[in-house]
Amino acid sequence: MAASGVEKSSKKKTEKKLAAREEAKLLAGFMGVMNNMRKQKTLCDVILMVQERKIPAHRVVLAAASHFFNLMFTTNMLESKSFEVELKDAEPDIIEQLVEFAYTARISVNSNNVQSLLDAANQYQIEPVKKMCVDFLKEQVDASNCLGISVLAECLDCPELKATADDFIHQHFTEVYKTDEFLQLDVKRVTHLLNQDTLTVRAEDQVYDAAVRWLKYDEPNRQPFMVDILAKVRFPLISKNFLSKTVQAEPLIQDNPECLKMVISGMRYHLLSPEDREELVDGTRPRRKKHDYRIALFGGSQPQSCRYFNPKDYSWTDIRCPFEKRRDAACVFWDNVVYILGGSQLFPIKRMDCYNVVKDSWYSKLGPPTPRDSLAACAAEGKIYTSGGSEVGNSALYLFECYDTRTESWHTKPSMLTQRCSHGMVEANGLIYVCGGSLGNNVSGRVLNSCEVYDPATETWTELCPMIEARKNHGLVFVKDKIFAVGGQNGLGGLDNVEYYDIKLNEWKMVSPMPWKGVTVKCAAVGSIVYVLAGFQGVGRLGHILEYNTETDKWVANSKVRAFPVTSCLICVVDTCGANEETLET
């Protein structure tokens, strides 16, 4: 009984599906017949007059497809009784396509007809076509057309399309303001745009540049709007150097007392203490940050050799470096500042050199309580952590210290489980991971494969799965829940192998080896790419940069870009958002 019941139930479901498919076929067939009747002008009861073109149709079909025609034909409007209905300000080809859609549910939307179709679909209230046009335009938004699409969406009451266009404008403002569309905007739209907190910029000087570009495009006619436009620039957020060298020298500013007052107000802001600055609200709200990640390399043993590497265009940019020579030091980046710690000349260096990438300025702070070289460092939540190292030729240390960037004070934390120097250390998801290294810098110092993790919340260390290969002087980077150990050396020589630690699984796995063996590897990761920018092979240095794609497990040797010439350099990823363009020029 039960089995037959199941069979009957299954049979009913199958019959329903077949009936639904058959119904769809029948409906398509009916509409196909009606469309043929329309083309043959059979039983048509209305003619749409569009300019000089006559388009026959059936009222019931138009009324079903369009709320506009539904109201026209079912109310007491004059057109409800007219055989010919004139559609003013309409394009014949577009109306033909909409009528065709009413019968077939098919329409071709492309870059040539989308604006006209959207306008007509909006006017005649044909929602499916309107949605198709909106979806098409959302996919086409770019820097050259986003402003026009935003205006169109506003005029045609398409909030979803406007939101997409506006979000693109704000996200890509630094590209948008350099287009012809931006220069041709009216003063109301420019003023509104420059006032947005959500403009994504590297620094406020880009907003200033946008304002000046717009004013100069038609200077005689836009002169009366100068104060209103420049009032939207947040001068206190512009660097003091840019204000004095570029803004103050601009003829537009010099010739206008009101604009000069804005610049002076911005310069005064830089003279205030941090406490007094916090009390100011007007003109100091930050914009949305446009992250600009670069890799900074500092000469170490050759301090005059300091550069940025830009992974977007593979360019090198010099950094002004006045600090002294350091051997086997470490560097980290936090909140616009690069901290250079440890290292030695004849003796360990006690001072910590600091470089502000936004202000392009150097200054010094008190370094780690225990001066040493061959240490490792990383940053997390406003704190700089240093681990291990050695005190000039001595055995490796268990030491673990922390510098609080807010209070500018050093604190000794619980020691590592294993003494180590020439190791790697990275922050990942709020935890501090330490991998590899050796027991000392002398020949007898055993190379390690051990790993451990520190939890700042509990101030405890936990031993982890060891690396497959013991290594020191290797690169160590964190990419998407994986920690990659790149090259380095074991007790026998240089390594080309690469392995990663899966944080979730607590295990190491080998991946594709480097196309080069590195006794010392200097690498950093931006996005999913690991860049090896410097290194030493034992008999020579790395000639050209190497790239490793962590998603495809592929290495590329870039023969067009020379590697950094100093193999004992320091390396870290920095965010130059906020830095003046002149500072970053190649």
Curated annotation (Swiss-Prot):
Residues 146-248 form the BACK domain. Coiled coil: none annotated. Keywords: Cytoplasm, Disease variant, Kelch repeat, Nucleus, Repeat, Retinitis pigmentosa, Ubl conjugation pathway. GO terms for biological process: proteasome-mediated ubiquitin-dependent protein catabolic process; protein ubiquitination. It is found in: Nucleus; Cytoplasm. Residues 44-111 form the BTB domain. GO terms for cellular component: Cul3-RING ubiquitin ligase complex; cytoplasm; cytosol; nucleolus; nucleoplasm; perinuclear region of cytoplasm; plasma membrane. Changing residue 472 to Q: In a patient with retinitis pigmentosa; uncertain significance. Kelch repeats lie at residues 294-336, 337-382, 383-430, 431-481, 483-528, 530-575. Transmembrane segments: none annotated. Pathway: Protein modification; protein ubiquitination. SMART domains: BACK (SM00875), BTB (SM00225), Kelch (SM00612). Widely expressed, with highest levels in adult and fetal heart, CNS and adult testis. GO terms for molecular function: identical protein binding; protein homodimerization activity; ubiquitin-like ligase-substrate adaptor activity. Pfam families: BACK, BTB, Kelch_KLHDC2_KLHL20_DRC7. PROSITE patterns: BTB (PS50097). Homodimer. Component of the BCR(KLHL7) E3 ubiquitin ligase complex, at least composed of CUL3 and KLHL7 and RBX1. Substrate-specific adapter of a BCR (BTB-CUL3-RBX1) E3 ubiquitin ligase complex. The BCR(KLHL7) complex acts by mediating ubiquitination and subsequent degradation of substrate proteins. Probably mediates 'Lys-48'-linked ubiquitination. It is linked to Perching syndrome: An autosomal recessive multisystem disorder characterized by global developmental delay, dysmorphic facial features, feeding and respiratory difficulties with poor overall growth, axial hypotonia, and joint contractures. The features are variable, even within families, and may also include retinitis pigmentosa, cardiac or genitourinary anomalies, and abnormal sweating. Retinitis pigmentosa 42: A retinal dystrophy belonging to the group of pigmentary retinopathies. Retinitis pigmentosa is characterized by retinal pigment deposits visible on fundus examination and primary loss of rod photoreceptor cells followed by secondary loss of cone photoreceptors. Patients typically have night vision blindness and loss of midperipheral visual field. As their condition progresses, they lose their far peripheral visual field and eventually central vision as well. This is Kelch-like protein 7. It comes from Homo sapiens.
